[in-house]
Structures are given as structure tokens and as C-alpha cells.
Amino acid sequence: MRHQLRIPLLSKPADQRKALLRGLTTQLIREGRVTTTKARAKALRNEAERMISLAKDGSLASRRRAIGYIYDKKLVHSLFEKAQERYGDRKGGYTRIVRTVSRKGDNAQMAIIELV
């Protein structure tokens, strides 16, 4: 039964879903914005905000957790350097989801997720 699901399943097995979200999170932190489907953007928001909260904490344990999740180690170091000055006064809401036009091939709802 699907009682109290906290993450959307995205029609993928658990390992593929985790790899997809890790890749999207890495791309979002690197580029600052990602165009994807609306469901993936909503799932990505949770992971990206968790990584930015770890970076704001700045402890060695949170740095190691971020290195274990984000694919690029240099990207983790730059995130930890910039997060405190960029998001120091914010308590959350580090991302913004903007809906765009539907995808041409299958009419899927698309969205742009970007860092605030």
C-alpha cells in the first residue's frame, strides 16, 4: 500500500530514481537552473534544499554527506563556500519552480527549477 509516501515514485525503480535525482541535483547546483518535468522538479526541490541546508551547516559531517550524494567533489566545495553568504538569512525556500509550455512529443507538463 502507498500510505504516506514522502517522495514521488516517478515511475522508476528505487535505484534509478535515486540516480536520476542525484544527477538532477548535481546539474541544478552546477548550472543554477534545470528544465525538466513538473513531477521531477517537485521531487528535485526536496533534494536540492536538503543539500543547501547541509552546505549552510558547514560541518565536516555534512560536507561528507554532500560528497556522498553529489557526483562532483569540486562542486561540493564551491557549494559549501558560497551557501553561507548566499543563503545565510534564509530558513528555506532556496529553489523556485516555474511552469513552462508542455513538451511537444508527449504533452508532459514541463517546469524550470532554479536556485533563488
Curated annotation (Swiss-Prot):
PANTHER family: LARGE RIBOSOMAL SUBUNIT PROTEIN BL17M, RIBOSOMAL PROTEIN L17
Entry annotated with the keyword Membrane: no
Pfam families (UniProt xref): Ribosomal_L17
Subunit note: Part of the 50S ribosomal subunit. Contacts protein L32.
Protein name: Large ribosomal subunit protein bL17
Transmembrane helix found in the keyword field: no
Gene Ontology cellular component list: cytosolic large ribosomal subunit
Entry similarity comment: Belongs to the bacterial ribosomal protein bL17 family.
Xref: InterPro entries: Ribosomal_bL17, Ribosomal_bL17_sf
A GO MF term: structural constituent of ribosome
Gene Ontology BP terms: translation
Superkingdom assignment: Bacteria
Keywords assigned: Ribonucleoprotein, Ribosomal protein
